[in-house]
Design a protein with these regions (language model features):
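Positively charged n-region of N-terminal signal peptides that target proteins for export
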Residues: 1-5, 19
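Sec-dependent N-terminal signal peptides
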Residues: 5-14
Length: 233
């Protein structure tokens, strides 16, 4: 009986130990690799579905500190955001980011030159929706954007999303929901099909979230999500 009791106690201790280790955060470090997986839920069942080839376009962005913002609601879009939101190309945005890398405000550039597509869309420009990037404690914020294609000047993205918690530790996993934004470049009044580009807005409008009140023909609501998962060394 004594031997049996000892075996049971050893097994119980082992079980508690395993559960504790599973709940403990990984060892704190100064840098962390994250896996980002993009899920596109914008599809033919969405309101005002524009086109059978609708997708998220190139993804561009960076890790950075709080001294810089590459886009922000309520402010005018930069030329790089302009080009991205209208054409899907992130080339000018990457140049803006590189300038902030040189200024010491950004660190790692995120650039994926392919489409992120909803399930069921088979197109030669669609690629794997998973990529990795590195974040450091010195540059813990992540901003990345992608045009809603086709659209006048609409996009999705993250803006200064922190990958560290209030205690300064890297967040193990996070799901970020993607809402549509209007870059304020093209005068889209919600009457025409979303793929038609009317004259440029003069004056240029501020970047804003697309809501039922803003009058665009897309959304509103969540069009996808990005799942971030830490990948400890």
């Amino acid at each position: 009986m004594g031997k049996l009791k000892l075996i049971v106690m050893v097994a119980l201790v082992a079980t508690i130990s395993c559960e504790k280790n599973a709940e403990e955060p990984f060892e704190d470090t100064d840098s962390m690799t994250y896996v980002a997986e993009v899920y596109v839920t914008w599809n033919s069942e969405s309101p005002a579905w524009p086109d059978k080839d609708a997708h998220f376009s190139w993804m561009g962005g960076a890790t950075h500190n709080a001294n810089v913002k590459f886009w922000e609601i309520g402010t005018l879009a930069s030329p790089g955001i302009d080009l991205m939101s209208i054409t899907g190309l992130t080339t000018d945005l990457i140049l803006e980011i590189q300038a902030e890398v040189d200024n010491g405000n950004a660190e790692n550039i995120i650039s994926r030159r392919h489409w992120f597509c909803p399930r069921g869309l088979f197109h030669r420009l669609c690629r794997e929706p998973i990529f990795e990037f590195e974040v450091t404690k010195e540059f813990p914020l992540v901003s990345m954007v992608s045009m809603l294609g086709p659209s006048p000047d609409w996009f999705i993205g993250t803006e200064s999303l922190s990958m560290v918690d209030n205690n300064g530790r890297f967040i193990p996993a996070m799901t970020y929901e993607l809402y549509p934004y209007d870059a304020g470049i093209v005068s889209d009044n919600g009457v025409n099909d979303c793929c038609d580009r009317e004259p440029l807005s003069i004056p240029q409008q501020n970047v804003h979230l697309i809501t039922p009140e803003t009058g665009e023909t897309i959304g509103p609501g969540i069009l996808g999500r990005i799942v971030f998962t830490a990948k400890p060394e």
